Amino acid sequence: MIIKKILSFTASIINLFIFIIILTFNSNAQENNFKYFSNDEGVLSIMYHRFNEFKYPSTNISMDIFKKHVELILDANLNFYHPKDFVNEFDIPKKEKKILLTVDDAFLSFYDNAWPYLEKNQIPFVLFVSTEPVGNKGYMNWEQIKEIERSAFGVIGHHSHSHDYLIDKSEEVFLDDIKLSNQIFKEKLGYVPTLFSYPFGEYSGFMRDYISRNFKIAFGQHSGIIDVNKNKFELPRFPINEKYGEIKRFKSIINYYPLEYKNLEPEEKKLSKENNPPKFKVRFFDEQKNIENINCYSNEGDKWMKSKIKLVEKELTIEFREPFLPRRGRINCSVNDDGKWRWFCTQFIIR
């Protein structure tokens, strides 16, 4: 009888332990459940679109400059992170900074120009595909996308169906768009990609919450460096184009490090008259040194200016002088931490 009770008690303990593990490591939780100062060296995600399409400077990069970017990364002894490893190891603090390469929209210029170079040098990347334009003029077709998928280092990501301004649409339209894209991915690839990129980097709380229940990771288009405490479904990337891909700037970007924080408010990134300007608050970890040196800049009133910040016991608040104007409001904060520049950005969509 005593032995049976001991065995029953032991089984209960094991079941409880398994339950706790499942709760702790649920990869589809909207945000990491446990926040701690990790001293993570970070993952720097960079985003490209077109290659050698000089008619579109806001989304284009020349191949010559792109190759120099890769050389700068390698010369800095930084390694490209395979997307699958990035997902599987997200909750592990990085002892060395890594680079995650992402490409949005599956333009034909990527396949014609960048893909042969990446294939030759076996550089891993994510290609985010919107299903509606596939096969149209200027876009890759499904056979070309499958060629990327068959490689050992190319991963296909989800970028909606229409690539529309979905944040402007009804919740029903957003859901229908994602579900239609899912059907097409299943038909063409046999599965639905688990990495997601919000079209134009825009999302509301509703969109983010839905994506968090159906994908493993999601990216915006706001700058910053990823660490284990960042929300898995609001991950930052540095957008690179002809203007913002200039070599001097790129050298600075790859030398940035994450600025970790416990909490950032507001969670809702879609602003209206009722909540614009937002009540912005960030709580940093007690272990973060030199946070008193932080500076923030914001484009409130459509004018970039130094923010009026208040820092009390590791909690930062910003007093905005004016509301943000459509379409995007941004706040960039950085701190010199004993020679390491730490950076994060928050983006709001203004309606």
Predicted features along the sequence, with ranges:
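Metal-dependent polysaccharide deacetylase catalytic core of the NodB/CE4 family, i.e.
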Residues: 41-60, 76, 89-99, 108-113, ...
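A ligand-binding cleft/hinge motif common to bilobed small-molecule-binding domains
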Residues: 224-228
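Catalytic-core region of carbohydrate-active enzymes that cleave or remodel glycosidic bonds
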Residues: 188-191, 213-223
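Terminal accessory/targeting
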Residues: 1-96, 116-143, 239-351
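Short, electropositive alpha-helical surface patch
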Residues: 176-178, 206-219
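Conserved beta-strand segments of alpha/beta enzyme cores
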Residues: 79, 155, 216-217
